[in-house]
């Protein structure tokens, strides 16, 4: 028995060495300051700055509770990811962990679902950029696709010049987002605390009770809204991908993850509560940031425009992060055979440029959608992005559970940074993600049609696997000698099925 355990541990160690070889070529240039701000910025994006307006109309003050619930489960997912990162930092993030603990088929599904997530999220961000630009009347007649193309040019260039520059620019993007929320919280609190009227109307809790209470449309609309709010936290797992290019991920990642939960509480829950105490919840509009709505009503010249520049930066930040993630995820998939061979190529700046260019092509499709149906793009692709997010987060939780099992069996070393309450919190998070899928079905028509498309997505994934399995088998036949013969046989048999 002891011999079998030892052999299993050696076999798993061999697989880890093979996976670590996939990290060659990256430049570990990110410092603590940058990782901290990337983690914060990942939790603050278009979902809050643009999506909150429409969601306040749908759920009213109950949106704060929805953000809190989603924020707690997002923290569980981040802690699970942190556990995996301390086990083995990887730019391939949970796709690489799926390959280690679940096999190549799981890595294939995880990778392509995550790509769907970021591809759709990028289209949402492109749409957001165009909507923000239309806030200024001078640009009202300019088609959305013009602004979308300009945004793609900017972020595409940023991602090609090296990870150090990406991290630095993302640091400043995130800092601007944080400062915007902080300024709103300070100004809004002053108005609320001093009893200063806004547009001649008193602020305070009466704005909730006088406008239908905490659940103005009932409980069901607030519950269904969870599937939309999930999108607001879509970038939190970015810190896992960034860990592969950190100078010291063992110290930086836990610190960054632990700082996220209270910031979610302050920035999301605190902001929504303050918004509904300053203005009636139905004063906020879909298509316009609620923060822009608030500052515009202060009567201070140009304050609305200044805030609009800030939220425009937030959309560009999210788009920038999406390109960063997809480039590295596609390279990880390519190294295992689940994506085309050319996507593994790196530039002299240590950038996986092929994957980034492939993502840019998909984003161009988003620009085309902006041209065809500019008014509906945001909601249409939001639901498809949610599918990718749910799948990605589910893989993180399952991989974390398999890591715990591997540690228990002696196949992997224990880690100091763990998900609190596991495995209960692991199963609870998976149940939450499943409930989000169920709730999406009630969001007619977009959510209902999205859930109805799941069989088609499954068929496409199966067809795609048959297209890549030969290359998967070939890669594992020529795997480096660090993987032992038994491991190679297992991998080759898996690829052949």
From Swiss-Prot:
NCBIfam families: PRK15049.1 (NF011623). It comes from the Bacteria. The chain crosses the membrane at residues 34-54, 58-78, 109-129, 146-166, 171-191, 219-239, 264-284, 298-318, 353-373, 378-398, 422-442, 448-468. It comes from Salmonella typhimurium (strain LT2 / SGSC1412 / ATCC 700720). It is found in: Cell inner membrane. Belongs to the amino acid-polyamine-organocation (APC) superfamily. Amino acid transporter (AAT) (TC 2.A.3.1) family. It is a multi-pass membrane protein. Coiled coil: none annotated. The keyword Metal-binding does not apply. This is L-asparagine permease. Signal peptide: none annotated. One of its GO terms (cellular component) is plasma membrane. Keywords: Amino-acid transport, Cell inner membrane, Cell membrane, Membrane, Transmembrane, Transmembrane helix, Transport.
